[in-house]
Amino acid sequence: MDDLQSQNLSMDMTDSPPALANNRLENGMAQLITTEAWNINSTDLVKKALVTVPAPSILNPPAESQSGMALKVAATVLQPLCLGESPVVMPIHMQVEGSSAPELNPNGNATYVMTTQGPVQLPVVLEQHVFQHLNSPLVLPQEAPCSSSTIHNNLFQGAEDPEAQPQLLDLRIPSQPQEPTLPFEAVLQNLFPSQGTLGPPPCQPPPGYAPVPPQPFSSPLSPLVPPATLLVPYPVIVPLPVPVPIPIPIPMPQSSESKFSSSFPKPPSSFGLHPFKGTQTPLEKDELKPFDILQPKEYFQLSRHTVIKMGSENEALDLSMKSVPWLKAGEVSPPIFQEDAALDLSVAAHRKSEPPPETLYDSGASVDSSGHTVMEKLPSGMEISFAPATSHEAPAMMDSHISSSDAATEMLSQPNHPSGEVKAENNIEMVGESQAAKVIVSVEDAVPTIFCGKIKGLSGVSTKNFSFKREDSVLQGYDINSQGEESMGNAEPLRKPIKNRSIKLKKVNSQEIHMLPIKKQRLATFFPRK
């Protein structure tokens, strides 16, 4: 090949055009633009083509003018083609139809393509396949260039169609050489060096390979193409209603307590949380101290509470004197029924001397005087004597009575000023018909009153607990004798209801006792309800 290339180079430099044409016919080769073409521009290529190619042909001598027209047209088409890294200049007869090219001699029809490895002999059919590969995306393997090239090789190797090749001038190629398959592979691997890493050689398809339609996402560019589900916009829109906040009724338990407490005048915050049970511990008595939240206007009159608890039946008799803000005489608070409930047997007793509520609230004093003695006549000859006790007696007996069974049911009225709880123990003896009774007295006076003495006809003795709220305010003095006479006179209706037990049960908790609507401050006694 080097000899052939040097011979063609010497012919191109020295010989005249007729001698050059004769030399081509003898060698049976077509003149190719030599290695000088890589260093010259396209105008020199056009001039060299116009000088070299218009030689008289043996088969068509009068066609010189026609060849000159074809070469003038070819001058605008003749450009170096960039195949891969190195440009490849194809012969003129490959670019222009109708040119009487001298490769039609019967001796041989092979041409050369300049590559980096030197000139490679290629048949005309394979030169056309180079253009077919240039038009097809060779880098994508799903296009299957080898299958199409083998089909065209079979077409052109069997018989050349004269209509498909007009420049052959109705002449068949006598025998197509079989060796150029290997050089064509070398050319394609040279022009496309990345193709060898993608799979088998381009012109030798793998066995059993058929030109099927390309499979989706099988190309090397498939990672650049997102899946079809990402291109659909609705999965982005579907999660949008999820962050919509759902309203959760968190303040509903508080509103239920506020509705329940709105029916009562200013109830404490812990209303209904501590039912009146007989097993209340001293810790639960401290939990009853949220009574301090109440407005002092509700309890401008602070009273003594006497609760007689029947020991075996876990029932308490409410004998408390209470004063609530001014209410009508016939107004009764709605009873709340619970299991461990107290018997509401309180009856209003008229007071002779009652100061106005503003004076009582401002002075912070209690309505009842601690110096009066109350004698209550109980059935079967029982008598409870209320004796005055000094304020110094109560703290001495404070720590001796903390028992969880008796301290359970004591009621504490709300003082105007919170003070220390003073608890005292005393012996109270009272006779029930078949049982001993526990008497729990809660005194809210400035000077606490303690049960003293013994009950007549005694058959059982019960120890009773006292709970005191001391007040630092000035004591309001009242007529003790008249109050004692009132209490003795009002204690008469107490006998009959206890004997026949025809008492309507009013079940209250530890805080509703402070809300019993009584018009005036009176001594609490029993009265029958039918």
UniProtKB/Swiss-Prot annotation:
* Pfam families linked: SOBP
Protein name per the record:
Retinoic acid-induced protein 2
Q: Name one GO cellular component term.
A: nucleus
Compositionally biased, Polar residues: which spans? 1-13
InterPro entries attached to this UniProt entry: RAI2/SOBP (IPR026092)
Name any Gene Ontology BP term: animal organ development
Organism, as annotated: Homo sapiens (Human)
Q: Where is this region: Disordered?
A: 1-22
